[in-house]
Amino acid sequence: MKKRSFIKVIFYGLVSLLLPLKISAIEKKIINPDLTDEQKRIMFREGTERAGTSPLNFEKRKGSYHCANCNAKLFESVSKFDSGTGWPSFNEAIPGAFKTKVDYSFGMKRIEYHCAKCGAHHGHVFNDGPGPNGKRYCNNGLCLIFIPE
């Protein structure tokens, strides 16, 4: 390992231990009383479902994807694509659907996104997606409800 990489790993590791991992002004509110314990863990404790476990990975019908907690419309099916990551992925969100914050967990900097209506954590957004904006919204499938057209 190069010295610079080693120092970077040590620095981010110390930062993640010394600072709160998630600093947020995002207000979170459980609205759906029927959420499972696993959905609550992901949506309100910033968890992640296992890759490849969501049936939504294989959903190909036209429709829209909504927050499993508050039913806010988040994505249209035309923005869904197979990223090969094992999580439902989208290249464009409904305008105003999400609030973002920086996540320093696991010694790296990522952008986490939350439902703007209820604050539920949905996943991370990366700059390696297809299309003109280059975004890849990597979403936990348990956080979504698909509503066909």
Please describe what each predicted stretch is:
Residues 1-15:
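N-terminal secretory signal peptides and thylakoid transit peptides that target proteins
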